[in-house]
């Protein structure tokens, strides 16, 4: 049984479905269906996304060595290719997206989410929250959450603040779970796929959270090579939510998480 997902907007009804592990879609123009809609579903410019992501059977990952690969600053032109390659490898990751990039890449964000990848917040414009007042911090977080909601139909529950700069005030204002990292590949600095590969292999340990950026093609290439190697060593690649579930951890919004060891 394939699960159907639909997005209803003023432009029409788009039905997305998984067929032979590929996301297909069928579109009906709004003016063709408006007569048949209940009043509460008729709209002007309101978008109501209803998406159901693929859920893996996590039982097969119990007692496995788990790594959470996390990607900041996207989505980007590399993301579509990347998620398709991840799918071939039965690997899922977490994307901490920048809110002001969501609209431009909404199609790939939907596809990533439908495949089972997790979407988190990286704030709206990547400002250092330590230097913002309460109103500005709130705006950075809420605008991102709304942007993500308008695309996938649910708000993120996890956030990674820019530069990893976090304090008690930011945690309190956000009311979200804060995920940082314990392995920084410095992929943004060197932009070298072989170095990315070596850093991931070098720091591969159960429970690690690895920081990367899918805006760089070198990062994408290095990651895919590392996944292929580490799969041979018995590692599995999971989202933050999957990691938390498999390790039976209850997240606390008053804490900041660097790994799940």
List PLM regions with ranges.
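Alpha-helical scaffold elements lining the catalytic groove of polysaccharide deacetylases
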Residues: 114, 127-154, 165-206, 219-221, ...
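Catalytic grooves of carbohydrate-active enzymes
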Residues: 204-241
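Active-site beta->alpha N-cap acidic-glycine motif
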Residues: 47-132, 136-143, 147-150, 154-155, ...
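Solvent-exposed loop/turn segments at secondary-structure junctions
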Residues: 20-23, 73-77, 100-103, 119, ...
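Generic enzyme active-site microenvironment
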Residues: 70, 120, 160, 211-212
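Compositionally biased intrinsically disordered regions enriched in Thr/Gly
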Residues: 1-67, 81, 89
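Histidine/acidic-residue-rich catalytic or RNA/ligand-binding cores of hydrolases
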Residues: 223-224, 249-254
């Amino acid at each position: 049984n394939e699960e159907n997902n639909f997005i209803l907007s003023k432009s029409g009804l788009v039905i997305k479905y998984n067929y032979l592990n590929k996301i297909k879609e069928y579109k009906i123009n709004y003016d063709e269906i408006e007569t048949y809609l209940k009043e509460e579903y008729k709209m002007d410019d309101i978008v109501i996304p209803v998406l159901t992501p693929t859920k893996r059977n996590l039982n097969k990952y119990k007692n496995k060595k788990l790594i959470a690969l996390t990607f900041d600053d996207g989505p980007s032109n590399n993301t579509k290719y990347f998620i398709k390659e991840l799918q071939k490898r039965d690997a899922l990751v977490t994307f901490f997206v920048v809110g002001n990039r969501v609209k431009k890449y909404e199609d790939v964000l939907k596809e990533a989410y439908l495949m089972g990848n997790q979407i988190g917040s990286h704030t709206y414009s990547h400002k250092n929250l330590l230097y913002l007042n309460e109103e500005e911090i709130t705006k950075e977080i809420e605008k991102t959450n709304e942007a993500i909601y308008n695309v996938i139909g649910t708000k993120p529950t996890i956030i990674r603040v820019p530069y990893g700069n976090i304090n008690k005030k930011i945690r309190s204002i956000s009311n979200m779970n804060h995920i940082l990292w314990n392995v920084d590949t410095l992929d943004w600095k060197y932009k070298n796929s072989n170095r990315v590969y070596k850093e991931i292999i070098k720091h591969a340990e159960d429970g690690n959270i690895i920081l990367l950026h899918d805006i760089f093609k070198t990062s994408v290439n290095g990651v895919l090579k590392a996944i292929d190697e580490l799969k041979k060593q018995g590692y599995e690649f999971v989202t933050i939510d999957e990691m938390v579930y498999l390790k039976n951890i209850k997240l606390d919004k008053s804490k900041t998480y660097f790994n799940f060891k």
